[in-house]
Structures are given as C-alpha cells and as structure tokens.
C-alpha cells in the first residue's frame, strides 16, 4: 500500500513510530490518492490564514506555498514516505524548505485536516452524482414526451393490473430520480461545512480564523463545535444512504427493462446488450443486470459504514480511516450506473404493437368497468363483485351482462350504457379516462411532464449555483496564493 516499511522517516510519527511490521497496515497513502488535490487545497488555505493572522511569517508562508506547488507538480506518486497523504505531503514540504515547512501544521491536527479533505472531495463527487441524475431525468422525460399515447400494460405483483402509457411509466421513474436528486443536494448542504480549526478536537489557543479558511475552500460555513467537527462522519452516512437510495431506484428500472425485454415490449440498443460466448442468437441485457447489482454494492457499503461508526466513542478513532472509502465507492458505482441506465432508456426501442396488444391482457380494464358502474350509482363494492364474477367468465360484455343479472337482479343496460361499457373495456379509452392529477391520460401527462421539466430546471440551477460558488472560491484561493510568488525567498 505504501513505500518500503523499513525505510523513510515520517515527520509525524518520528523514528520511534515510523517503522515496524504494522506500518503498512496503518498506511492509507495509496488509497489517499483520491484526496491528494483536496489536501493541497486545504494546506494552501490553512497557510494563507496562518500568515494573515500573523501566526507565521509571510516569508515562511511563501516558502511553504512554493513547496506545495512542487509537490503538486510531482504528483501523488512521488510521495514515498508517510502513513497517509497528509503526513507524506508535510514530509515532502519539509524536505524542500527545511524546518520552516514544519510551520505548515501549526494550529492544526490531522483530525480536522482529514475531515476537511474528505468533505472537500466528497462534495465534488456528490455534485457529479447529481449531474448524472439530472441527465437521466432529462432523458426519461424526453422519451416520455414521445409516448404519451403509447398504451402499455401496468403491473402489480408482476401480474397485468391496469393499462397505462409508456410516458406514465417513465415519468414515475423520473419522479423517483427527482427525489434522489433532492436527497443528494440535501446531503451536500451538510457536507459543505468546514471542520478546520477544530485541531485534535478541543480547538487551539492560536488566534485562527476558521471562517477565512472555510471561505477560501468554498465551504458554506463551519462545523461550530470542535469535537463534533473532528469526529463527525454522519455526512458520510447520509451521502451513502442517498447513493443507496438512488441505486435502488435504478435497480427497479433495470429489472423492469430486463423483464420487458424478455416479453418483447422493448429492445435495448446493441450498445447496452451483449451476446453469449456459445449461443450466437442471444442478446442479453447485461448492462441492466449490472445496474441492478449496484443496489447491492451500495447497500453493502452503507451497512459497512454504519457498522464501523456504531459505538465509536468521541472524539477521534482510527476506525474512521475505513469509513470514507465506502461513501466514495458508493458514489462512483451509482454515478456510473445512472449514466448507463439513462443511456439505455434513451436508445431503447419501445415496441408499440406488442405493448398495445398486451395492454388489455388479463382483463386489465376491470377496474375501469367497476369505476364506471360506481359512477352510475352502483356501490363500488357491489360493482367490484360484479366485475370479479365477469372476470371468471372471460371479462367481455357478455360476461358482464350475465354477472349483472345475478348480482344486480336485472340487465346491465339498466345501469350503464353499453357503449360506455365497451369504451371502458378498451385499453386506450380506459387510459384516456384516467385524467385525475398524476394519471396516465395524455392531458394529465402533458401537465405532469411540464411540471417535471420545471423541477429539473430548478435542480439544474441549484447544481450550477453550487459549482459556481466552488469555482469562485477556487479562483480567490488561487489569486491569494499567487500573490505570494513575488514574496517567495530566493
């Protein structure tokens, strides 16, 4: 995982703790490549603040910042010493500028430093996941807009239940993804708080400015209590739970597409399928099966994270080193799965004739007939019994008439017009009648798709605002750091 266990000196652990067989076990240096850039940003912001607060001299700050530039140019792979990226960078800085490099860690602990780096990187990954959900929602809504009148079977218990439309079906997943987007954005708000200045957990006697480092790093504020700031990892739980929820949404969509593909309702584009190594006729929905499996990956990560955190005493424990990888891995997996699922839907061929034919199977319009009778004054429970009796006899008008004679004691025509019943039996007419808010009727769906588009636009703007704020902070940090170039000692 890291460099030779018997060579190199870690400036944090010193000679006494720098060697031994456990060094590799303790090390997270290789895994920390993900937060390498985050650590450099955190170091720069901290050094600028130390200088501005007259805690270290400007010449020392300039030297340290210059060394950090060298470390960045050399890359993570050049870090050979240190049990983690934070210690390794500090070691590299001291190697370049001597003892003045040791001032970089003034008024700071690795506890608050690590927490800041995790939050700094995690927020970027959360926004990437948000972007993926936005693109998926847009694709779902685009395809739905093309199929507001494409009738299809709707299911409960995987049995034909009621006819609906492809638009109604896809909009249901767009709605679920909108909630997933909302959960990710909510998590972002709690991730994007700075723990810097908490030090080990009890703060520091130095006259630091926590708000300044938060500003330079683009955080929306600070985690006020220093013990909470250093030890809290609930933001990881929230993020991983949001990722697992998103993966569960995608798993349902993927499962549907696998089933629909088997039934001949939809055909995935070749780019989202594969064939068999032995059976040349096969076209397998492999990508959807892997999307489906992502729900297991993310749920396992959430369970592992919760188990790691369960029962940890305040304030810092090394168990936390094993915590954040689960959040990163969950976000990686679900972001890719979202992109793949969206592409599969966008390029799929919905087989309208097959869908239309299947829409009426299993007497799926039965509820519509019962509703019609109830509208004409027949108690719904009685109408339900009548239609259930007719379903046993075939579910056509003749069966309904016979059931009416037995249950209502007279002809069906005394209660409802035959033409109305026949319309209720027709899947397309049945769908068109369901124009209540949220229903599948074309007019209702047009309104729903419009509202979904507006919500999508609002969420896209929220993403732009957050990324814009981070970019502004990065520009300001770069401007301030660059101003030290002219003061750097020769």
From Swiss-Prot:
Residues 469-480 have a biased composition (Basic and acidic residues). Residues 440-452 have a biased composition (Low complexity). The keyword Cytoplasm applies. Its EC number is 4.3.2.1. It comes from Natronomonas pharaonis (strain ATCC 35678 / DSM 2160 / CIP 103997 / JCM 8858 / NBRC 14720 / NCIMB 2260 / Gabara). GO terms for molecular function: argininosuccinate lyase activity. This is Argininosuccinate lyase. InterPro entries: Arg_succ_lyase_C, Argininosuccinate_lyase, Fumarase/histidase_N, Fumarate_lyase_fam, Fumarate_lyase_N, L-Aspartase-like. It is an enzyme of class 4 (lyase). The lineage of its organism: Archaea, Methanobacteriati, Methanobacteriota, Stenosarchaea group, Halobacteria. Pathway: Amino-acid biosynthesis; L-arginine biosynthesis; L-arginine from L-ornithine and carbamoyl phosphate: step 3/3. Residues 426-452, 469-490 are annotated as: Disordered. PANTHER family: ARGININOSUCCINATE LYASE (PTHR43814:SF1). Gene3D superfamilies: Fumarase/aspartase (C-terminal domain), Fumarase/aspartase (Central domain), Fumarase/aspartase (N-terminal domain). GO terms for biological process: arginine biosynthetic process via ornithine; L-arginine biosynthetic process. It catalyses: 2-(N(omega)-L-arginino)succinate = fumarate + L-arginine. It holds the Pfam family Lyase_1. GO terms for cellular component: cytosol. It comes from the Archaea.
């Amino acid at each position: 995982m890291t460099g030779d266990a018997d060579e190199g000196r870690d400036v944090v652990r010193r000679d006494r703790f720098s060697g031994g067989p456990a060094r590799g076990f303790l090390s997270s240096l290789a895994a920390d490549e993900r937060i390498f850039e985050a650590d450099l940003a955190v170091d720069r912001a901290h050094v600028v603040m130390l200088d501005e607060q007259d805690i270290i001299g400007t010449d020392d700050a300039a030297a340290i910042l210059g060394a950090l530039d060298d470390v960045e140019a050399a890359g993570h792979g050049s870090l050979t010493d240190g049990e983690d990226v934070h210690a390794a960078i500090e070691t590299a800085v001291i190697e370049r500028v001597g003892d003045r490099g040791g001032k970089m860690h003034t008024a700071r602990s690795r506890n608050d430093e690590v927490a800041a780096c995790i939050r700094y990187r995690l927020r970027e990954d959360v926004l990437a996941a948000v972007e993926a959900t936005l693109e998926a929602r847009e694709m779902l809504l685009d395809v739905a807009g093309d199929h507001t009148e494409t009738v299809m079977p709707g299911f409960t218990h995987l049995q034909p239940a009621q006819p609906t439309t492809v638009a109604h079906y896809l909009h249901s997943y767009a709605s679920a993804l909108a909630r997933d987007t909302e959960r990710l954005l909510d998590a972002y708000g709690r991730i994007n708080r700075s723990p810097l200045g908490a030090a080990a957990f009890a703060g520091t006697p130095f006259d630091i400015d926590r708000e300044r480092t938060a500003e330079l790093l683009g955080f929306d504020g600070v985690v006020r209590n220093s013990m909470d700031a250093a030890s809290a990892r609930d933001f990881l739980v929230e993020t991983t739970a949001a990722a697992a929820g998103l993966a569960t949404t995608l798993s349902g969509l993927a499962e549907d597409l696998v089933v629909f593909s088997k039934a001949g309702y939809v055909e995935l584009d070749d780019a989202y399928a594969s064939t068999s190594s032995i059976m040349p006729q096969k076209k397998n929905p492999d990508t959807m099966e892997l999307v489906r499996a992502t729900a297991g990956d993310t749920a396992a990560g959430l369970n592992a994270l919760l188990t790691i955190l369960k029962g940890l005493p305040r304030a810092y424990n090394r168990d936390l080193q094993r915590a954040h990888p689960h959040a990163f891995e969950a976000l990686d997996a679900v972001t890719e799965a979202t992109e793949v699922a969206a592409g599969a839907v966008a390029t799929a061929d919905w087989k309208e004739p097959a869908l239309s034919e299947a829409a009426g199977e299993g007497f799926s319009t039965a509820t519509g007939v019962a509703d019609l009778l109830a509208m004409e004054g027949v108690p719904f429970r009685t109408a339900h019994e009548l239609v259930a009796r007719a379903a046993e006899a075939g579910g056509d008008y003749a069966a309904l008439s016979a059931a009416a004679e037995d249950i209502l004691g007279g002809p069906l025509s005394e209660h409802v017009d035959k033409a109305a019943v026949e319309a209720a039996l027709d899947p397309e007419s049945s769908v068109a009648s369901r124009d209540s808010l949220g229903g599948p009727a074309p007019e209702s769906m047009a309104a729903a798709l419009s509202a979904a588009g507006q919500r999508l636009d609002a969420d896209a703007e929220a993403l732009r605002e957050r990324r814009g704020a981070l970019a502004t902070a990065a520009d300001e940090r770069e401007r301030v750091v660059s101003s030290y170039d002219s003061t750097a000692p020769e």
